């Protein structure tokens, strides 16, 4: 007897030795070590145990059918010569049969022969097996529930039938009693003698007749109820029989499902076997066919030709299989074991082949047959159209990103772009195939076309930056506070910082006002402090907001002689929004008209309460001129910093905020950044908004080159590819490729979002602009020294727009004015405004030759005032009516061919020939017009003054009377201002 060890058997079964020993122990085979011997009896006991455990059915025949479906596309020209794409779906199936002798046989479709060898059973993994078992369990549970519902319905129906039967029996008993009583009363009446004459009708007889009629009616009703009850019983029996048949069908289905699942489990647990080749039948020689390209198959039997156009009977495939059982199909040897659907495997006619009549009509679906009658091909196409099954519209889940073009959206919905454009036209939007759509519009369109719109998850490479930053774990150490100085314009913010830094910045600024954010750090006796100096002018709101965002403490500077002003209130709002503490510095206390108490009261109204009033904001009176109170101010700032316990990691990749950015002609893009955490080094890869680059050089606020910058240190970096946006966050990346990918992604995302919003705004305002008429535009190109000034100037100029004159910003950028800017101004007829920047020689010469106006400004007030003046000149003037004189009609002269001549006396002002007039009668306006002629004596005159008489003729009007008053007026144009 052949035997093997447990370890070898486990290796053969691809199982662990411990698992096999546990199964052997459960099967009753006492094996304890991997070296124990196993004989055939032990293996048979293990197999029986596994079959009983996995629910294998006995010797019943099992059949498993696997189906494969593939879809391809072909291009075929139709009758008109146009190429069409046709989808071809091929379905193949394979059937496995488990016979009594344990041999697996692969049964193909009836129309095909059995293959010589059956391939090994496909290996299905444990997940697939678990899924099939779960599906079989759910099917059995569903069948059980259906059986319970059927039994409950049958029980309710039987109870209802019993109740109706009892009610009908009671009604029949009552009717029988009434009939017996009526019959007894009738017999009693018949036994009495009849009188010779007809007496008057007896009331008793009338009552008896009524009783008899009622009894007959009740009998009739009882008979009808009996018939109805019999009919209902028959229907209930039929329904019960149907329920029994349905329950039996459900039981069969459940048993089949369970047996199929058991067969799958058994097949997966046992090794694959090959079926013995089927016995060969005696070969018959098939006569050779003429005019064919195919070789005659060996052992083929000629098939009986079918009737022309006759549809195949249901038993035709089986008969065909029996007739061709001995054929050897050459393609069957070459193809895989997947068999095609027999309904579609029909002969394809080839060149020169002799086909059966009508065979080509149903098989050659690619193109209509050449020749023949036209009606025949039309009928073939109609038959093919009738046989095509209706296709249901698929509901697709469309993931819609922030912006998507029309072509991409059509591709996601599997429709043509023209259909999407058509639906958008119905929704009131005129689009092109490459036009980007915003997310809301795209989602509405997807829902309109019957699909499901889902907000797409951002495929954002920026998520990697979050992971990289979160992975950096470094010890947080105390850092210096970042202090922002805010307040109204000319309240002494920069002068205060100059005294602290021992510098003179304010004297060198244009107009004596700050127009940039200045970043400095100062070493004091108690530690270092970083200062941000923000502009106070109203145009620099965005700069002040950026300063408050990057700060830890805000110093609010208020002039003691001026009090709380609009930008002071705005600075308080920015500090509240950033959630940072406020230290109030009451400046200019050295002036004789200083009033610190008034400043305190005004700030209390703005909810900035001093500490002596029970608030949380320290107030320090200072003087930037004499230095009074400066030390106390720094003391309060450092005290607030100690309370905040400011910390940041030092030994980590730097992260911070872009405070200001500019384009330097010699150094390229330059950005002033504030390091908030980590350490920035020369050579680091920096990502700032949609730009990136390697730090080539770092300068401090004094212009000295430094190698590293820690937390709370403002530095100026060089090496970026473009000028970043002020206010963008910057971070150091470990990989330059990753930084480039993220920067490119951000730039494309910003561009698509901007285009989509612009297009939506254009479509929304199209009809409004058409109704409003033509609006005068002032095209402007702005070039500034830094990005913050360019942003502030653009916002200030846009605020000047009115309903009649609008400011159009053609282009805004930082850097010097170049020839490309002048060419753009020539094309757009724009005015170039240079703010703290100049044009190079080539740009100046090109502008002079083409008449381009270039304006240079150093103070933002001047730029705004001059543009306001220019826009005022473009406004349409107001028309104002001015009365210049009155005249009274004293006499009327009738002149033929001329009409009525009025003799008038000028009572006030002057009467001019070119002026317009009103005819007043009883202080009511009768006519408004103009003069045809004005004469004094016989001479034509241009005007007649007060106290003189004149004769005049009113143009196209003769209905004048004596005593009427003529009022003369002129319309003058008055210039408007913004």
Curated annotation (Swiss-Prot):
Chain residue ranges for the region called Disordered: 107-129, 146-387
Subcellular location as annotated: Cytoplasm
Record region (G4): 587-590
Main location: cytoplasm
Annotated segments matching region G1: 487-494
Residues annotated to bind GTP: 487-494, 533-537, 587-590
Family, similarity comment: Belongs to the TRAFAC class translation factor GTPase superfamily. Classic translation factor GTPase family. IF-2 subfamily.
Alphabetical list of HAMAP family matching this protein: IF_2_B
Protein name, UniProt field: Translation initiation factor IF-2
